[in-house]
């Protein structure tokens, strides 16, 4: 499977952070995002070809994170702390506008059959 583009990673990363309370450790994002994109463990552990011994997937997520910082959706490392990715107020607003979570209460008891109205 081919890796998604950096641009394709940005919104799922923003929503992943939002859905986990707005602040996460960087290392906790790589695997869940990889699963969103259908990457296998093997694909997520392919190393960069530059002899730095860093997974290519982690590097791609970090670049997407940098773009979110540039958009002012995430705090930079000086503001949030090294290894912590934290949404800004603008990032929270953006995530809320994109979020598909629905806060709907469903009744516990739903009749199994419904009667159709009779036509006279």
Name each region found by the language model.
Residues 36-40, 71, 101:
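Conserved, well-folded catalytic cores of nucleic-acid-processing
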Residues 31:
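Basic nucleic-acid-binding interfaces
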Residues 2-4, 34-62:
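Short, positively charged loop/turn segments that connect secondary-structure elements
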Residues 69-79:
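A short, conserved structural fragment
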Residues 89-120:
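Short, amphipathic alpha-helical interaction segments positioned at domain boundaries
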Residues 65-66:
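Short, hydrophobic-biased segments on the C-terminal half of alpha helices
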Residues 2-28:
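Positively charged, polyanion-binding regions of nucleic-acid-associated proteins
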Residues 81-88:
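Minor-groove-contacting beta-hairpin "wing" of winged helix-turn-helix DNA-binding domains
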